[in-house]
């Protein structure tokens, strides 16, 4: 097996890693290190921090965020399908209908379980 043909790929990967790592290391080594309490405090538009930055959030915010990402990805999968609708034919149309049916059933399940209720 001739591995010489992979040398440009290896070189490309090494140069890419070096371009990312070398500035980080140089900044860490050569940069000034003068810690100060004001630098370590959170910044809130020029005001003193009102509350602890590590306050707890209700888990429903995370659930809504996950559901948003899920249905946002659904739209991202639908755009290429819509562009190539004429080329994929009936088989592609049926596949997308199955995909949408699964997502609608999942959404209905989340709604029925009360995941979207804020009371």
Curated annotation (Swiss-Prot):
Transmembrane segments: 9-29, 63-83, 88-108
Membrane topology: Multi-pass membrane protein
Keywords on record: Cell inner membrane, Cell membrane, Membrane, NAD, Quinone, Translocase, Transmembrane, Transmembrane helix, Transport, Ubiquinone
Entry superkingdom: Bacteria
Record's catalysed reaction(s): a quinone + NADH + 5 H(+)(in) = a quinol + NAD(+) + 4 H(+)(out)
Subcellular location: Cell inner membrane
Signal sequence region: none
Molecular function as annotated in GO: NADH dehydrogenase (ubiquinone) activity; NADH:ubiquinone reductase (non-electrogenic) activity; quinone binding
PANTHER family: NADH-UBIQUINONE OXIDOREDUCTASE CHAIN 3
UniProt-listed HAMAP family: NDH1_NuoA (MF_01394)
Function: NDH-1 shuttles electrons from NADH, via FMN and iron-sulfur (Fe-S) centers, to quinones in the respiratory chain. The immediate electron acceptor for the enzyme in this species is believed to be ubiquinone. Couples the redox reaction to proton translocation (for every two electrons transferred, four hydrogen ions are translocated across the cytoplasmic membrane), and thus conserves the redox energy in a proton gradient.
Assembly behavior: NDH-1 is composed of 14 different subunits. Subunits NuoA, H, J, K, L, M, N constitute the membrane sector of the complex.
Protein name: NADH-quinone oxidoreductase subunit A
Origin organism lineage: Bacteria, Pseudomonadati, Pseudomonadota, Betaproteobacteria, Burkholderiales
């Amino acid at each position: 097996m001739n591995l010489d043909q992979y040398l440009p790929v290896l070189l490309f990967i090494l140069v890419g890693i070096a371009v990312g790592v070398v500035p980080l290391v140089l900044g860490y080594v050569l940069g000034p290190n003068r810690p100060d309490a004001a630098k370590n405090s959170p910044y809130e538009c020029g005001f003193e921090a009102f509350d602890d930055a590590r306050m707890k959030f209700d888990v429903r915010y995370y659930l809504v965020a996950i559901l948003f990402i899920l249905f946002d990805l659904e739209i991202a999968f639908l755009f290429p399908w819509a562009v190539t609708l004429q080329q994929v034919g009936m088989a592609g149309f049926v596949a997308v209908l199955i995909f949408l049916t699964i997502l609608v059933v999942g959404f209905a399940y989340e709604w029925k379980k009360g995941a979207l209720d804020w009371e």
